[in-house]
Amino acid sequence: MRRPGAAERFGMKILQINTVYGEGSTGGIVRDLHDLCADRGIACVSAYRGPAKGRTAPEDTVAVSSVWDGRIHGQWSRFTMFKGTGSLLKTARFLRWVDGYAPDVIHLHNLHGSYINLPLLFEYIKKRGIPVVWTLHDCWAFTAICPHFAMIGCEKWKSGCRDCPQKKRFSSAPVDLSGPVWRAKKAWFTGVPQLTVVTPSRWLGRLAGESFLGAYPRETIPNGVDLDIFTGTESDFRARYALEGKKLVLGVAFAWTDAKGLDVFQALARRLPEDYRIVLVGTDDRVDRTLPPRILSIHKTADRRQLAEIY
């Protein structure tokens, strides 16, 4: 595990915590914020569940968990519904490191990747009184087990989850423990002395305000865009895929499901005129098997310049 070093010569020290680093949507956001801090002379360390087997952690990052610990924690979470209650030893070790680093601000992101013990983490934060910014990328922080509920119109999270309609999707537990899980999360996540909730949209901010996180101050900060990459870009994308003269409808997601609107694009493909084509980025072989011919599928990519060419 990385020890405090030369970067800490600067004044403010920030610690970010997220499931992943440098991959996927939230991992890219964490990496970009990490790099922005470095450019501005602010010390920043990003903690995440750890690199995949055979890979090494990037500089100025900390692996909270390990591959095997994550698997055990994940299975425990699936069968008990209590995500974030494993990884006791790994989290205790990580928090000893945090004491040595002594961050001025902790920036939380996604905590639901079966890599960190949430009761230990929040007990530590409350005792130390460290200011916290918590950026919510979905709704998991204020529900029992689900990251999204709009599809099914569930509002039980406002007063207390119970009889979870998405239990089979997110848990293998033999009984529904969504009520105790929701109450536990409320106890863990409330009562932090200095915590600000940040959301990338007003919609998510409104939902957070209606939840048990509503007592905290909230800010809406849209996700940033790297204008050095996402700018006017020469591209042969249309010619490469025989799309010249077509009107394009573009959809981009890290993992396509009906919750991300996959079913809407499938229905749209059947209704649009012939001079339209739909392009979905972030697909995989499983999604490909469900797509009609008029949808162009482009598999997941971590190459932001390729994305800029498509845009």
What are these regions (language model features)?
Residues 8-12, 234-249:
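Nucleotide-sugar donor-binding and catalytic loop/hinge architecture
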Residues 39-105:
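A conserved catalytic-core segment of Leloir-type glycosyltransferases
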Residues 276, 282-308:
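Nucleotide-activated donor-binding/catalytic signature segment of Leloir-type glycosyltransferases, i.e.
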Residues 198, 242-260, 266-270:
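Conserved donor-binding/catalytic core segment of Leloir-type glycosyltransferases
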Residues 96-116, 130-137:
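Short N-terminal targeting/anchoring amphipathic segment
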Residues 126-127, 140, 156-197, 206, ...:
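Membrane-proximal helix-turn-helix segments that form the acceptor-binding/catalytic region
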Residues 206-209, 225-240, 288-290:
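Acidic anion/phosphate-binding donor-loop and adjacent secondary structure
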Residues 8-59, 126-130, 266-273:
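N-terminal subdomain of nucleotide-sugar transferases
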